């Protein structure tokens, strides 16, 4: 079933049951490879293996952490590398997986930035810009972090 009208209506080509040309619409699909193993495929053909953590495949929780880290990495890199290219750039995203009477959840989510810049005036400018870039990514720019923090509703549909 294809969405019609309202927020689900887009102009373009249908792929994976959704439009692909709308610049604000995003879609991925998952294909089952075997019991508890899947391949996620984006609209551009990129693939990621997903599993339960028994092998090297990413778990869904790890992919959420990757999404948060990747989103903020792009923001912070764009805002700071205008001043100077980093000497090193690493972001670590960690959380505790908890279970209570309401179900599974993540707690104590922490994003740690380990970024260094070269010595000199341009590196100094990038270092000075870093705290503001991190704040802007967290407060406004990172769609993934904002969706998690704001509690974006998730609808489901069976076709």
Enumerate the predicted regions with their spans.
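Extended beta-strand/beta-hairpin segments
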Residues: 12-66, 76-159
């Amino acid at each position: 079933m294809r969405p019609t009208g309202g927020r689900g209506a887009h102009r373009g080509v249908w792929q994976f049951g959704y439009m692909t040309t709308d610049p604000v619409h995003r879609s991925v699909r998952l294909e089952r490879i075997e019991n508890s193993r899947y391949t996620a495929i984006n609209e551009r053909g990129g693939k990621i293996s997903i599993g339960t953590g028994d092998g090297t495949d990413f778990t869904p929780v790890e992919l959420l952490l990757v999404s948060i880290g990747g989103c903020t990495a792009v923001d912070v890199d764009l805002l700071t590398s205008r001043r100077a290219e980093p000497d090193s750039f690493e972001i670590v995203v960690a959380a505790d997986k908890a279970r209570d009477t309401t179900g599974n959840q993540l707690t104590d989510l922490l994003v740690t930035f380990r970024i260094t810049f070269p010595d000199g005036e341009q590196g100094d400018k990038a270092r000075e810009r870093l705290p503001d870039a991190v704040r802007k990514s967290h407060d406004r720019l990172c769609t993934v972090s904002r969706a998690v923090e704001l509690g974006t509703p998730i609808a489901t549909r069976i076709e």
